[in-house]
């Protein structure tokens, strides 16, 4: 295997590790109940999903955050189907919006953003957003850890903060180690290197399909969530397919070949996350048992999930009309 191929697979593994961190740690349910085999299995699934997402990002030349939202919806739907269908689709169709598109979709988008930022911080606006986004994630994580065991212990049993942070650090450590090891090889990597040849791409799709069979056989995954997820993935794929443009620069062009971010940025991101987490964890309950900071988080996930596709559709439709008007075709 060539050095470039090793780098490409390193990037896929790195993004897979970030997706695992987002889906199992930031969306904290009961990760201490997972065995080593469970963690390895979910890490393998997340790496396959990361491989698919990076291929589609390069194949269809995604250009902006709205293309990224269509892309990460596919990732969120696959995570919901393959890693924890009992949690993701516990109350279908409500949890399809709140937990899959809302929670998994948003954290997946953030993990993609973190990966790109660590590859190269090229924009001052991006620099200004890094630490606030990290702090927001820490605040949300602290609220979830503190109050979810109180109001929904069946979702997230109580775990001492110190143990939760140790596990979070243990899962994030491979992400940081992979980034550190890839810092120099990333300087020679180009976006189109992330595309798979046709046969490996088809094998990847076949592997993802095969991984859904055990859940279908055991009944953990029912036909309703499966059909709905496949339809939504088809919508996302169509958006990416019809949005592709061989002429316009793609999002990955701004980050690859990489000029890796200084290590102090990663320390700052971790520091902002931890500080906000500790602050939120020690806040008293604001409001009542029905309306409080945890309730606001859950409503926020629901709103994100409900608006995910309509927002993408509205923005892309507006841009298409605007482009046609500029060409005097309307």
Can you say where each PLM-predicted feature lies in the sequence?
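Membrane helical hairpin/interfacial module
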Residues: 35-88, 95-97
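Membrane-embedded alpha-helical segments in integral membrane proteins
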Residues: 17-31, 81-87, 142-151, 205-216, ...
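N-terminal signal-anchor module of multipass membrane proteins
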Residues: 1-60
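Hydrophobic cores of alpha-helical transmembrane segments in multi-pass inner/ER membrane proteins
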Residues: 43-54, 102-117, 166-183, 229-243, ...
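Extended, charged low-complexity segments
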Residues: 208-330
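Membrane-interface helix-loop-helix junctions at boundaries between adjacent transmembrane segments
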Residues: 61-70, 82-161
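Alpha-helical transmembrane segments
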Residues: 8-23, 74-75, 133-139, 200-208, ...
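Generic multipass alpha-helical transmembrane bundles of integral membrane proteins
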Residues: 114, 128-238
């Amino acid at each position: 295997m060539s050095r470039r191929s090793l780098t490409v697979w390193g990037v896929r593994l790195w993004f897979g590790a970030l997706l695992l961190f987002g889906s199992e740690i930031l969306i904290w349910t009961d990760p201490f109940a997972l065995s080593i085999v469970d963690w390895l299995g979910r890490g393998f699934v997340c790496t396959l999903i990361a491989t698919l997402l990076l291929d589609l990002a390069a194949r269809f030349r995604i250009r902006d955050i709205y293309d990224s939202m269509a892309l990460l919806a596919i990732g969120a739907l696959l995570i919901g189907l393959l890693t924890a269908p009992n949690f993701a689709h516990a109350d279908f169709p409500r949890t399809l919006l709140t937990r899959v598109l809302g929670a998994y979709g948003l954290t997946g988008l953030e993990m993609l953003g973190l990966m790109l930022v660590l590859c190269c911080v090229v924009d001052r606006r991006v620099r200004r957003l890094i630490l606030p986004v990290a702090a927001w994630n820490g605040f949300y994580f602290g609220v979830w850890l503190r109050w979810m065991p109180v109001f929904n212990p069946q979702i997230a049993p109580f775990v001492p903060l110190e143990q939760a942070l140790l596990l979070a650090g243990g899962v994030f450590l491979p992400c940081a180690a992979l980034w550190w090891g890839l810092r120099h090889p990333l300087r020679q990597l180009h976006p189109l290197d992330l595309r798979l040849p046709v046969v490996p791409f088809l094998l990847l799709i076949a592997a993802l399909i095969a991984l859904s069979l055990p859940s279908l056989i055991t009944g953990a995954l029912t036909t309703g969530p499966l059909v709905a997820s496949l339809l939504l993935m088809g919508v996302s794929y169509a958006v990416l397919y019809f949005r592709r443009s061989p002429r316009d620069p793609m999002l990955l062009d701004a980050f690859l070949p990489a000029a890796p971010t200084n290590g102090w940025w990663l320390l700052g991101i971790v520091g902002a996350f931890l500080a906000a987490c500790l602050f939120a964890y020690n806040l008293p309950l604001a409001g009542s048992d029905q309306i409080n900071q945890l309730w606001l988080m859950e409503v926020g996930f629901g709103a994100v999930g409900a608006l995910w596709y309509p927002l993408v559709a509205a923005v892309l439709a507006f841009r298409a009309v605007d482009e046609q008007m500029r060409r005097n075709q309307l």
